[in-house]
Amino acid sequence: MKSCVLAYSGGLDTSVILGWLQDQGYEVHCVYVDLGQPCEDRDAIMEKARTCGAKSSRLVDVREELCRDFAFPVLAWQAKYEQIYLLGTSIARPLISKVCLEVAREVGATAYAHGATGKGNDQCRFQLAAEALDPNIEMIAPWRIKSFRDAFPGRTELIEYCDVKRIPVKASTAKPYSSDENVLHISYEAGKLEELDVNGVELVEFGMGVSPQDAPDKPEEVTIGFESGVPKTLNGKAVNALEMVEQLNDIAGRNGVGRIDMVENRFVGMKSRGVYESPGMTVLYDALMYVEQLTMDRDLMHLRDRMAPEVAEMVYYGFWYTPKMDALMSFIETAQRPVTGEVTLQLYKGNIMVSSRTSPNSLYDEEIATMEGGGSYNQDDAEGFLRIQGLPSRVQGRVSPRKF
């Protein structure tokens, strides 16, 4: 019998896909990848999969790995897709594929199935990651298969299939949008959010924090310490990557930090609207930036900043396991070596303001930077500097005089 691993959530879609795969003659191994998504009873989901005919089911907790090995390297790049999206969903997908393929190798499965649609980005991220890790894996994306779409044109048919197969599904009140959550962020899209005249921030019931208007009237300070670009301490206490993100989610969330509403360019060609909240990661991006301002060489920082949009694109599109990304990650690891220090931020009604920053590797020299008289900067040196810098402009001006 053919064997398949299924990225399984226990929801309606993957419950139906589990049954459908068995109808197609597959032995199915269900994998629930714990990224920090909300779930009432993970044990019940695993039992449900086995009850519904799965050969095996397992939960794999990768929350720490997601923060440490995926989100934090992207943070070091200050990578934001189209300038504002912190890639909370995008960066989780290659990890899901990695976990599912590890299980496939263990159980001898030759196929990998997921429930992503044929119109979104996730299908790209799942498949590009999986085929990079195992070029021989058979990808099964039911929503890209016409016979599956014909059988299940809507939610009603999905529920009817579950009734016939005696697959237990919990009835839920349909919200006017869909959401996807992990420890890094929550994304909201589709439904009423596809109407651009709808105020997304007012429509969405945010799950990670309060609105800026409802945040406390007094600023809250938070101090974050970095070692070579990696967040290590929070308010003076050493924490692991997961603890850092979870605790900052609470702190930043209660101060209304980290909400965005954007229209983005999907990899598959269309524009789509997304509303996102990433309170903890938003604070980390700003905190790291302030330590970098002290410690990174100017030209190195500017080079990183020019390359960061390309890194964001690669993550967003799904090109995580590539030689190019490997090289880029080696670069950023070297670039971040001096980025050690501590920064104190004030969080106030959605805003992030720096209070202080310090670093043993600081390149800031008050004696050089002072605008007062004296200091160690000799202003006479600027004369020769500007004569050399201005030479091309003077020559060009003689050859092609500008009208003014």
From Swiss-Prot:
Name of the molecule in the record: Argininosuccinate synthase
Oligomer status and interactors: Homotetramer.
Keyword check for Chaperone: no
Record has Oxidoreductase as a keyword: no
Pathway: Amino-acid biosynthesis; L-arginine biosynthesis; L-arginine from L-ornithine and carbamoyl phosphate: step 2/3
Family: Belongs to the argininosuccinate synthase family. Type 1 subfamily.
GO BP: argininosuccinate metabolic process; L-arginine biosynthetic process; urea cycle
Gene from which the chain derives: argG
Disulfide-linked positions: none
Provenance organism: Rhodopirellula baltica (strain DSM 10527 / NCIMB 13988 / SH1)
Positions with a binding annotation for L-citrulline: Y85, S90, N121, R125, S178, S187, E264, Y276
Sequence positions that bind ATP: A7, Y8, S9, G10, G11, L12, D13, T14, S15, G115
Cell compartments where the protein resides: Cytoplasm
Gene3D superfamilies: Argininosuccinate synthetase, chain A, domain 2, HUPs
InterPro entries recorded: Arginosuc_syn_C, Arginosuc_syn_N, Arginosuc_synth, Arginosuc_synth_CS, Arginosuc_synth_type_1_subfam, AS_cat/multimer_dom_body, Rossmann-like_a/b/a_fold
Keywords: Amino-acid biosynthesis, Arginine biosynthesis, ATP-binding, Cytoplasm, Ligase, Nucleotide-binding
PROSITE patterns: ARGININOSUCCIN_SYN_1, ARGININOSUCCIN_SYN_2
GO terms under cellular component: cytoplasm
Broad class of where this protein is predominantly found: cytoplasm
Top-level enzyme category: ligase
GO molecular function: argininosuccinate synthase activity; ATP binding
EC assignment: 6.3.4.5
Catalytic activity: L-citrulline + L-aspartate + ATP = 2-(N(omega)-L-arginino)succinate + AMP + diphosphate + H(+)
CDD domains, per database record: ASS
Alphabetical list of HAMAP family matching this protein: Arg_succ_synth_type1 (MF_00005)
Annotated positions binding L-aspartate: T117, N121, D122
Origin: domain of life: Bacteria
